Amino acid sequence: MTKCLGCGIEIQTISQNDLGYTSNLDNDLCERCFKLKNYGKYTKVTLDNYDYLKIINSISENSLIVYTTDILNLTINNIDKFKKVIIVVTKKDILPKSIKDEKIINYIKTRYKNVIDIVVISSIKNYNLDHLYNKIKQHANNNPVYLIGNTNSGKSTLINKIIDNYSNKSNKKVTTSMYPSTTLDKVEIDLGDLKLIDTPGLIDNTNIINHLDNKEVKTITPKKEIKPKSCQINGKGSLIIDKFVRIDYETITNNSLVIYASNNLNIRFNSLKKEISKNFNNTEFNLKPKQDIVIPGLGFIKFVGPIKVNIYCDKNIKPYSRDNLI
């Protein structure tokens, strides 16, 4: 059985409409990965999490797990069964340089007790990759290392950077993009002294990225350092985040908020709005002091004081509150 070196799917020449199609079984990439890699043409694939969970359940609890999570979301799932987990917080380059790694590491430490290390990285900037690679080798004990995480968490980008930095250059790279579900099955990478296994990303249906078209995904995906937008607020008003989210707020004292999201988004403040998209649902939060609202896949809003907020967004998206990350 020959697998696509980009996404891990089994290669076939029978049906052009099915996954894994290629015109020649000698090709390294399926047609989907070839077009994505060479022309930036993305073909969306609708998957469920059955195969992902099947892979996770097949991994020994004693295996070393490298769990990647996007710094804007910090979504961490399916690690409870494993005894050795390194959490890798990706995309450090999109947060302001003033935000220290220790703040993020300590935040995760207080919430996840069964991790052996937490490393904040930027694959794009090569930041902390030597440190991470040494940690992986230290804990691997010559056994395969599994990389898991949600779709679009930076998993495949990290693997390609590891191939660039530490392999003998004969390894083929896995397919990467800003779009969800690029990896479709397990992809094994043999680095000589280390074997990595990339797995398909868990599809989080509460994440906005899984409900947008390609152009919208480009709009909400930060490509460079975020410039936080802050505002002093009092009384009632609305925060509009492009066409994706509306947040109505009500505070009885002076308050402030800071928005961490892509610089491409049109963000504005208005007096309390009444019109609501028919596809938007309302979620109400009564926030305590120093809490965030996270819009999965989009970013987060930091509030300083207590405040009541109503969040209107796509009915599939599930915003949530947490203690201030920053």
Identify what each model region corresponds to.
Residues 66, 86-87, 119, 146:
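A structural signal for isolated positions on well-ordered beta-strands in alpha/beta enzyme cores
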Residues 76-79, 96-102, 206-209:
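Conserved ATPase-coupling elements of RecA-like P-loop NTPase cores
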Residues 158:
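Hydrophobic positions on the alpha1 helix immediately C-terminal to the Walker A/P-loop
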Residues 94-153, 161-165, 173:
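Canonical P-loop GTPase G-domain recognition
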Residues 56-60, 74-83, 108-112, 136-139, ...:
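Alpha-helix C-terminal capping segments
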Residues 74-77, 129, 155, 185:
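Short, well-ordered alpha-helical microsegments
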Residues 51-55, 77, 103, 131:
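Well-ordered alpha-helical segments embedded in enzymatic catalytic cores
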Residues 2-65, 69-72, 83-86, 92, ...:
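Helix-rich effector regions associated with P-loop NTPase G domains
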